[in-house]
């Protein structure tokens, strides 16, 4: 009898050219650190091959980008239909959600419906609010939004000398819609504020919240290594939107008032 497990990993990172290294490391943690097993890693941005449904899996992992399908009712309905075999599977199921404050009630119903065995998530002090039903079980485990990989540790053993770095201060973030509250708003404006306050100081800056300036893959690590200082802010949201009602209202408003 083989000791190898058949494991299905579901993510939705889309085009590999746009993957962010830290997200990829979370989604691929099992193939990277337990490569002795048999894996099917499926990008849910692509159609699901029919043969996948015929495999008897020992484990199924629902990655954070796959669970983002909860944000859009039509996408969620399509996901629940197309991946109904996951619900019926006897495999041990693990979910790794992020941004739990966004559509948390929808997410909890989904995880309960699919009989997920373990949920690795953040904010343990708020589990009773985010997951009132799951919190009453032994399902929740502390997880993190990112991890330091072995390859990253090895890379930083000899970082670029401080004096050789060509960027004095850098920053990248997205300007988030209002449904993320004050925390989301501050994350989107601190770069602009810093630029305004230091315009005549002679710093070499690389600060942007423009989507076209997103840095993908390992190029992000190069960017960090070439920066002397990086601006930072709290991540997440200052609003809890369990049913996605705030998100829907904001999206609707912005259509007419961009």
Stretch-by-stretch model annotation:
Residues 41, 95, 121, 141-146, ...:
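Structural signal for conserved beta-strand scaffold positions within catalytic alpha/beta enzyme cores
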Residues 18-20, 142, 149-258:
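Conserved catalytic-core segment of nucleotide-activated headgroup transferases in glycan assembly
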Residues 3-9, 166-168:
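Residues that mark the start of a beta-strand
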Residues 6-137, 151-156:
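Extended catalytic core of nucleotide-activated donor transferases of GT-like folds
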């Amino acid at each position: 009898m083989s000791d190898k497990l058949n494991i299905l990993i579901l993510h939705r990172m889309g085009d590999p050219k746009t993957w962010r290294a830290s997200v990829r490391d979370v989604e691929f943690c099992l193939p990277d650190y337990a490569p002795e097993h048999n894996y099917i890693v499926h990008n849910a941005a692509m159609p699901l091959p029919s043969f996948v449904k015929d495999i008897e899996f020992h484990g199924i992992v629902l990655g954070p980008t796959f669970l983002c399908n909860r944000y859009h009712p039509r996408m969620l309905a399509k996901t629940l239909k197309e991946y109904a075999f996951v619900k019926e599977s006897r495999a041990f199921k693990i979910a790794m959600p992020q941004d739990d404050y966004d559509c948390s009630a929808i997410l909890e119903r989904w995880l309960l419906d699919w009989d997920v065995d373990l949920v690795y998530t953040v904010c343990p002090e708020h589990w009773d609010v985010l997951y009132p039903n799951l919190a009453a079980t032994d399902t929740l485990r502390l997880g993190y939004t990112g991890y330091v990989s072995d390859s990253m540790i090895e890379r930083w053993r000899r970082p670029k000398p401080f004096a050789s770095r060509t960027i004095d201060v850098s920053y990248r973030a997205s300007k988030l819609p209002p449904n993320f509250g004050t925390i989301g708003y501050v994350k989107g404006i601190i770069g602009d504020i810093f630029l305004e306050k230091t315009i005549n100081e002679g710093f070499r800056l690389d600060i942007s919240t423009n989507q076209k300036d997103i840095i993908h893959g390992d190029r992000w690590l190069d960017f960090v290594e070439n920066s002397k200082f990086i601006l930072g802010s709290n991540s997440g949201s200052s609003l809890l939107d369990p049913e996605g009602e705030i998100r829907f209202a904001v999206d609707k408003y912005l259509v007419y008032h961009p």
